[in-house]
């Protein structure tokens, strides 16, 4: 255990015997300090949308298929021209040093071990270059919270390009911080600095809450901003935080190379729909023009299957990976991915689907309780 400014950072490095991801969360709560756990696990206001992200997966059911001669399903896929061994990826999540002393560096190692993709956050505990290097050549994206300071944006985009990342994720649903009651109750302020802010900003984020940090980000974002980012970098730009078909088409029209359906894990607009409930409509509007990425609420292999069958090309997981990081470092991250991949393989076989392409063509039953 390492103590920084009174905050205890875990140093665990071990494989995990994962039963399910809900149990993993309970285990992580025991070892992550209260303020850090509240920041990681919490949603906005009374967390209605956070809960809806889980309930939404009950709105569709997978049709079992038995007489299909299927065995040994294959998880390999290719998105943005990037070959991947799993359709799962690690979402951009801030300040992973709250869970483990090595933070994003260990997350990158764990994701690389399963042949997956990781997305770095602007507000990472470790630098773009260090995180990319620790991934041993595995593909990574970099997520940008667009700053009011264009020089800051350019510096991050330039470093991301030098570090070899494969795409830029532009977050557009965080022009103001959601009202996060857990952070208020815990009077939570980041106890450790954010490496990219340390390097390129006058303030490293240490000793501040997320609302104060967001205050330096752009308070309004439009399609012209998407175009500006897309014109500046030659990397594909994926627009994150899309929940309406209209916004998806605006983003594509402005130069987006990908659409990322997400409600920020229920941390922003409380009272909005679950991301899974809007995924199919957004994917239909996109109509194959660009890849569709999805996150929010994934906890089971069946959730992954349903997301892929509803139009997602890549499926993101966030909090469970951070819990795995806290409990086991890089090996813990690897354990979380392997558990979900295993569940997905079982579901694929029972649903008569051999490949991820088969899953994407699978029909789901629409049922509302």
Curated annotation (Swiss-Prot):
It comes from the Bacteria. Keywords: Flavoprotein, FMN, Oxidoreductase. InterPro entries: Aldolase_TIM (IPR013785), Alpha-hydoxy_acid_DH_FMN (IPR012133), FMN-dep_DH (IPR000262), FMN_HAD (IPR037396), FMN_hydac_DH_AS (IPR008259). Residues 13-369 form the FMN hydroxy acid dehydrogenase domain. Its cofactor is FMN. Belongs to the FMN-dependent alpha-hydroxy acid dehydrogenase family. Homotetramer. This is L-lactate oxidase. It catalyses: (S)-lactate + O2 = pyruvate + H2O2.
């Amino acid at each position: 255990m390492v103590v920084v400014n009174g905050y205890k950072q875990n140093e665990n490095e071990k494989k995990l015997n994962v039963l399910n991801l809900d149990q993993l969360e309970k285990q992580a709560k025991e070892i992550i300090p209260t303020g850090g756990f509240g920041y990681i696990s919490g949603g906005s206001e009374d967390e209605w949308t956070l809960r809806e992200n889980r309930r939404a997966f009950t709105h569709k059911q997978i049709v079992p298929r038995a007489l299909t001669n299927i065995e040994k399903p294959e998880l390999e896929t290719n998105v943005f021209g990037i070959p991947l061994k799993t359709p799962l990826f690690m979402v951009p999540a801030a300040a992973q040093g709250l869970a483990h002393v090595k933070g994003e560096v260990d997350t990158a190692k764990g994701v690389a071990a399963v042949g997956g993709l990781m997305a770095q956050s602007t507000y990472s505990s470790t630098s773009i270059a260090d995180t990319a290097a620790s991934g041993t050549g595995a593909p990574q994206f970099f997520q940008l919270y667009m700053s009011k300071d264009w020089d800051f944006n350019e510096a991050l985009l330039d470093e991301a390009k030098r570090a070899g990342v494969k795409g830029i994720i532009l977050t557009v649903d965080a022009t103001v911080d959601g009202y996060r009651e857990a952070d208020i109750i815990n009077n939570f302020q980041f106890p450790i600095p954010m490496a990219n802010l340390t390097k390129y900003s006058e303030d490293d984020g240490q000793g501040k809450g997320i609302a104060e940090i967001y205050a330096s980000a752009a308070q309004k974002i439009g399609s012209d901003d998407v175009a500006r980012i897309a014109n500046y970098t030659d990397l594909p730009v994926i627009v994150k935080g899309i929940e309406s078909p209209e916004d998806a088409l605006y983003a594509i029209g402005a130069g987006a190379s990908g659409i990322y359906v997400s409600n920020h894990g229920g941390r922003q607009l409380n009272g909005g729909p679950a991301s899974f409930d809007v995924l199919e409509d957004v994917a239909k509007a996109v109509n194959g023009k660009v890849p569709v990425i999805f996150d929010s609420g994934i906890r089971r292999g069946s959730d992954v299957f349903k997301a892929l069958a509803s139009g997602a090309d890549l499926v993101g997981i966030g909090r469970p990976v951070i819990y795995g990081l806290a409990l086991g470092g890089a090996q813990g991250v690897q354990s979380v991915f392997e558990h979900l991949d295993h569940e997905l393989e079982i579901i694929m076989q029972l649903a008569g689907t051999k490949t991820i392409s088969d899953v994407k063509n699978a029909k789901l039953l629409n049922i509302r309780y």
